[in-house]
Amino acid sequence: MKSNLKGDKQFASKAISYMMNNERTKIKEISYSINNSQVYRKNANTSVVCLHPYSTEIKFMNSGVLPQITKPNSGVLNIATYKFEGNDFLGGFISEESDLCFNSILYNVLSADKFKSEFYNMHCKGVDDNFGNEVIYSPKIEINGVECGVVTSALPYCSMFGGKDANLLFTLRERVDRILFTFALNCHKDIVLGIYDLSLDNIKPSMLAESFSVYLNDKYKNIFETVTFAIPESKTYKKFKEAFNT
């Protein structure tokens, strides 16, 4: 489905060329990732067992997500829109998600028919305006020359909660649980969490930061070797550091 976002025409032209070139030159890689990608539903069990405990290093970087993807088999968070694959990448809309799409086969994977029917279309039809807790996990997405597992998830619409912070915080925590569980289940010990300017969704940075802090210091403590928050927006970056007392 086409979005109504107004994108940059030059970027759109480059995006279309990049996507088509991937379709010609990376057929096997795209097919593998599509066939092995999975939608994790909101009612799935998220219990975890720590088989190889780590002394987790948590890092905060005031940058976009791409420069922080350096380790093989990294898990990468793609905070996305649930209604338009690639956040209207082909329409020229520039975002953190489009940066990932412009440097990998991610758009070619997310635009597959299986995800349109299982994921995006149901949200366009308003089946769940709050987007539930579904995420898409896509393996073997090469970014910066290393293979990664990408978790595509969206944040809830703040307006759905009518200013009730307690309800929003509960939902944010559920979403964070699903994201971290998916990385743990797929054996990613190094994860890069790209966090954009949360003011776009009227979400208080402190609330999302607290949600990650609660889980990384309890349920997912020692599950990961490194957790890197890539946060280009300065106010959000500051709030995340405060939540972790760094």
Model-inferred region functions:
Residues 1-246:
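Macrodomain-like recognition of ADP-ribose-binding/processing modules
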